[in-house]
Amino acid sequence: MIKLNQIVKRYHTKDKDVLAVDHVDLNIESGSIFGVIGFSGAGKSTLIRMFNNLESPTSGEIIIDGDNISQLSKSQLRKKRQKVSMIFQHFNLLWSRSVLKNVTFPLEIAGVPSGLAKQKALELIELVGLKGRESAYPSELSGGQKQRVGIARALANDPDVLLCDEATSALDPQTTDEILDLLLKVREQQNLTIVLITHEMHVIRRICDEVAVMENGKVIEQGAVSKVFENPQHEVTKRFVKDDLNDDFEDSLEYLEPLDHDAYIVRLNFTGENTTEPIISYMTTTHNIDVNILEADIKNTKNGSFGFLVIHIPHISEEHFKQFKHNLHEQHVNVEVLKHG
């Protein structure tokens, strides 16, 4: 279990004080994958660097498995960092060392005998899919391969927690998915708790159990990923979800021809089993209305599916529309009016 209690981080500059992290509270369950998302400057990188005391909080407590990180002595902190490991956006590999030597490096620092260190490193290199590349140097590797080395190195001391600081931001979409799949694999095999920060909602949706959304140093929204996608509350969260769904229809509403007085354009939002229900068939048969499909998409999270459907209803009375909306609501389909004639 990881607990953050009222974490504050201030930077003092010549001209002013900067509040980078503003009274953040988080509870992260052991064995879960917890994501923190925010735009640049939101405070997420500063926050994650306080988990292993690369940055010290100005005030507040970070407790990992019962240890208050800020109160550990230097020797205790060094030992704790072996159990709270980290991977980085730009890999931070040692360019003069081979893949094998990069992975053995933290074991050398920990005083592990060279034979055991080599054996452990070879096992980890195979785990991350780089068997046969032990003698290669970082300059000979692709971005995805470099991050695989970073993951293997981070696992060398059998950590309980893996911190991921924008670990996929420098990668192309396909390689990103491969690294995310690898993180899921090592989480299961190593029984890890993973905390990752990102500005990509796709990353959150694909592997996280819970998410916290940050803006201006504050956590503005938090919850299970499926619930946050289903019903985002804050405008920043709505923007992330909208971008992930490629839902840009509202931006084009003003360019549509004027609607008839009894016409509607609505968005239907649905989750879980509703994503496979014949909603269009229900509308046409039960309510005897014509619909035009303008836009649609479905996405999957670890805990279920969610999606939306934008439709144009050319003719429907106000009373009929109220009944239609009520009936869909009973089926757990949210109806949002985007435009009305």
From Swiss-Prot:
<dbReference type="InterPro" id="IPR017871">
    <property type="entry name" value="ABC_transporter-like_CS"/>
</dbReference>
<keyword id="KW-0547">Nucleotide-binding</keyword>
<dbReference type="InterPro" id="IPR050086">
    <property type="entry name" value="MetN_ABC_transporter-like"/>
</dbReference>
<keyword id="KW-0067">ATP-binding</keyword>
<dbReference type="InterPro" id="IPR027417">
    <property type="entry name" value="P-loop_NTPase"/>
</dbReference>
<feature type="domain" description="ABC transporter">
    <location>
        <begin position="2"/>
        <end position="241"/>
    </location>
</feature>
<dbReference type="InterPro" id="IPR045865">
    <property type="entry name" value="ACT-like_dom_sf"/>
</dbReference>
<feature type="binding site">
    <location>
        <begin position="38"/>
        <end position="45"/>
    </location>
    <ligand>
        <name>ATP</name>
    </ligand>
</feature>
<keyword id="KW-0029">Amino-acid transport</keyword>
<keyword id="KW-1278">Translocase</keyword>
<keyword id="KW-0472">Membrane</keyword>
<comment type="function">
    <text>Part of the ABC transporter complex MetNIQ involved in methionine import. Responsible for energy coupling to the transport system.</text>
</comment>
<dbReference type="InterPro" id="IPR003593">
    <property type="entry name" value="AAA+_ATPase"/>
</dbReference>
<keyword id="KW-0813">Transport</keyword>
<dbReference type="Pfam" id="PF09383">
    <property type="entry name" value="NIL"/>
</dbReference>
<dbReference type="GO" id="GO:0016887">
    <property type="term" value="F:ATP hydrolysis activity"/>
</dbReference>
<comment type="similarity">
    <text>Belongs to the ABC transporter superfamily. Methionine importer (TC 3.A.1.24) family.</text>
</comment>
<comment type="subunit">
    <text>The complex is composed of two ATP-binding proteins (MetN), two transmembrane proteins (MetI) and a solute-binding protein (MetQ).</text>
</comment>
<dbReference type="Pfam" id="PF00005">
    <property type="entry name" value="ABC_tran"/>
</dbReference>
<dbReference type="InterPro" id="IPR041701">
    <property type="entry name" value="MetN_ABC"/>
</dbReference>
<dbReference type="InterPro" id="IPR018449">
    <property type="entry name" value="NIL_domain"/>
</dbReference>
<protein>
    <recommendedName>
        <fullName>Methionine import ATP-binding protein MetN 2</fullName>
        <ecNumber>7.4.2.11</ecNumber>
    </recommendedName>
</protein>
<keyword id="KW-1003">Cell membrane</keyword>
<dbReference type="InterPro" id="IPR003439">
    <property type="entry name" value="ABC_transporter-like_ATP-bd"/>
</dbReference>
<dbReference type="GO" id="GO:0005524">
    <property type="term" value="F:ATP binding"/>
</dbReference>
<dbReference type="GO" id="GO:0033232">
    <property type="term" value="F:ABC-type D-methionine transporter activity"/>
</dbReference>
<dbReference type="GO" id="GO:0005886">
    <property type="term" value="C:plasma membrane"/>
</dbReference>
